[in-house]
C-alpha cells in the first residue's frame, strides 16, 4: 500500500478524552473513531490489526477442534426467559421491541442461543464432544464506558461453547480451551497468566481469567514469578490427549496467581519474598465451566450409551479481539508510539522515501516495494511529499516492526537503512541484500 493513497487520519495532539495509552495511541494513529459514548468505528489501520488478531484466534480454536458458526446479534427474549437470565441480567442488557411488539435484545453473550441450536440437532452421545465458536459484535450498556475499546459498550467477542456427556468430558474440553488460550496469547506476542476467577453473571463452578501485565491495568494482580519461566505448548501438541492437557493445566495452575478480588493473604504469605510479584494487569480472556446451568432449564439432553437421557455438561470460553488490540498496545509501546508484534502488525514493513523527487530514491523504493510484495510481505510505502521528520514520526507512531529508510546520501552508496522499531537498532544494507534477506524468511 502507498501511503499517499491510504486513509490514515493521524492526530498531532493527544485527545483530551483519552485517559490511557492505548486509547490515546489508537486515536492518534487513526485506528478508531468514536461515534458516540462507548461505540467506535474501526478505520483501515485498526481494521487490519483487528483482522489479524481474529485470524490467530481462529487458527488456534480450530487447532483445538472448535468449529466456527455465526449467531445473530439480535436475540429473542424468550430464550433468556427460559434460562432464567432475562430479569437477572440487569440494565447492561439492551432490550428492544420489534414492530410486532415482540421482546428482543442485543446479545451481550450467547449461552442461550447456542444451547438452543445444540438441542435442536444433537441427540446422541455419539455426536459428542462438540465445541462451537463464533466471532461477533456484542453490546453491553456499561454505566461508564471509558478507556476507548478497552471498556466500550459495543465490542467484538470470540465465544466458544463446549458440550459433553458428563463432567469428566467437560473438564477435558475446559483444559483443551485453557491450552488453546495459552497458545493464542503467545502467538499475539503476549505472556498471559491464568488466574482463578469469579464466575459472575455467566455462572458456573470453575473459571479462569487470563491476565497480561501492564502498568495501566485495570486491576491489581498478585502472582508467583515462576510463571514467567513456563513454556507455552508447541503447535504440535496433541489436543486429543487428555493426560497431556491435564498436565499442562496443572503446571500452569500450580503457582499462586490471583486478581485483587480473589486474593488470599494466607496463601500469598506462603510464596517466598523473592518470587512475589504485585503489579497491574488487564484481562484478555475468560473461560468458564458451568455444567448443567443452561442445559437443565433449556432441556439440552442426549441419549447416552446406557439408553438413558443425560443433560449435557457445558463450558464457555471468551476472548475479546477488539479489547485485545488495546491490551497489546498497553503492553507494547514507548514514548513515540505503538510497537506491534510481527504477528499482528498492520503492515510488515514501512518504507520511507526521504526525498520523493529524487529519481534514485524513488527507484530504490519501488524496487523494495515490489520485491517485498513478491516475497509475500505487505509493505507500506511512505511516498508523500512530507518532511523526513514527519515521516519518521508517522512510522514510529503506527509501530510497524521494521522501517526501511531510503535517503539520497545512503542510496548514493547503493545502501538503505534498516531500523528495528522495538530495539531502535539500525543497520545499513544494499537493496539487493535487503531483498535477499527477506526472501529467505
Curated annotation (Swiss-Prot):
Keywords per UniProt: Aminoacyl-tRNA synthetase, ATP-binding, Cytoplasm, Ligase, Nucleotide-binding, Protein biosynthesis
Chief place where the protein resides: cytoplasm
One MF annotation (Gene Ontology) recorded for this entry: ATP binding
EC code(s) of this entry: 6.1.1.15
Lineage: superkingdom: Bacteria
Reactions catalysed: tRNA(Pro) + L-proline + ATP = L-prolyl-tRNA(Pro) + AMP + diphosphate
Cellular localisation: Cytoplasm
Enzyme class: ligase
Signal peptide: none
InterPro entries documented for this protein: aa-tRNA-synt_IIb (IPR002314), aa-tRNA-synth_II (IPR006195), aa-tRNA-synth_II/BPL/LPL (IPR045864), Anticodon-bd (IPR004154), Anticodon-bd_dom_sf (IPR036621), Pro-tRNA-ligase_IIa (IPR002316), Pro-tRNA-synth_IIa_bac-type (IPR004500), Pro-tRNA_synthetase (IPR050062)
GO cellular component: cytosol
Quaternary structure (record): Homodimer.
NCBIfam families xref list: PRK12325.1, proS_fam_II
PANTHER family: MITOCHONDRIAL RIBOSOME PROTEIN L39/PROLYL-TRNA LIGASE FAMILY MEMBER (PTHR42753), PROLINE--TRNA LIGASE (PTHR42753:SF2)
Family per record: Belongs to the class-II aminoacyl-tRNA synthetase family. ProS type 2 subfamily.
Function: Catalyzes the attachment of proline to tRNA(Pro) in a two-step reaction: proline is first activated by ATP to form Pro-AMP and then transferred to the acceptor end of tRNA(Pro).
Annotated protein name in UniProt: Proline--tRNA ligase
Organism for this UniProt entry: Bartonella quintana (strain Toulouse)
